[in-house]
A protein has these predicted regions:
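Alpha-helical transmembrane segments of multipass membrane proteins
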Residues: 1-5, 38, 42, 46, ...
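Juxtamembrane helix-loop-helix connectors linking adjacent transmembrane helices
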Residues: 16-88, 95-100
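Membrane-embedded alpha-helical segments of multi-pass membrane proteins
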Residues: 1-4, 69-76, 130-135
Length: 155
C-alpha cells in the first residue's frame, strides 16, 4: 500500500518512485548489509543485557524439523517487509517532502515523533520504549541525510 501511494505521489511530482530514498540500483548493496550488521549488533547487545539482568531467559529451541529452517526464513522476509514499509513511509516520502519544504531538522523531528507516537498503539509499550524508538528514528533520519539512502535503515 505504501508503495502504491508513493507511486501516485511520484507521478504527480514527476519523480521516479525510487527517488525517495530507496534507489533500485543500490538494493541490497553495501549500505543494506552494513545496516544488517548494525541491527544485529544492537539486538545482540540488548539481548545480552536482558539475559544478564534477568529480563529474559532461554529455555531451548521450540522449532523442530523443517520448521527450524522455514520459520526463521519467513520471519526474515517479514521483517524485511516491515523495514521497507516503515522506512519508506516515514523516512521516504514524508521526511524528504517535509525536508524540501521546512528543512531537515523540522522534518526529522515531525516524522520521528509521528513514528514514535504510532508505536503507542502496540500493546505493552512504555515511555522508555517510546523514547528509544524516538532516538532510533532520529538516528535513521541522520543516516538518510548522510547517505541519501534508506537502505542502511532497511537493513
Amino acid at each position: 500500500m505504501v508503495l502504491i501511494v508513493t507511486g501516485v505521489f511520484a507521478l504527480c511530482e514527476r519523480r521516479r518512485i525510487d527517488s525517495y530514498g530507496l534507489p533500485i540500483n543500490e538494493a541490497f548493496g553495501g549500505l543494506f548489509w552494513n545496516g544488517v550488521v548494525a541491527g544485529l549488533a544492537v539486538v545482540a547487545f540488548v539481548a545480552a543485557g536482558m539475559l544478564v539482568t534477568g529480563g529474559m531467559r532461554i529455555h531451548g529451541i521450540a522449532l523442530r524439523g523443517t520448521d527450524l529452517i522455514s520459520s526463521p526464513l519467513l520471519w526474515l522476509v517479514g521483517m524485511l517487509l516491515v523495514g521497507v514499509t516503515e522506512e519508506y513511509f516515514f523516512r521516504g516520502y514524508a521526511l524528504q517532502s517535509l525536508w524540501r519544504g521546512a528543512g531537515f531538522w523540522p522534518a526529522a523531528l515531525i516524522t520521528t515523533a509521528l513514528f514514535a507516537v504510532l508505536h503507542l498503539l502496540k500493546p505493552h509499550e512504555n515511555a522508555i520504549d517510546i523514547g528509544m524508538i524516538f532516538a532510533l528514528g532520529l538516528i535513521i533520519c541522520i543516516s538518510v541525510r548522510i547517505t541519501g539512502s534508506l537502505w542502511w535503515a532497511v537493513g
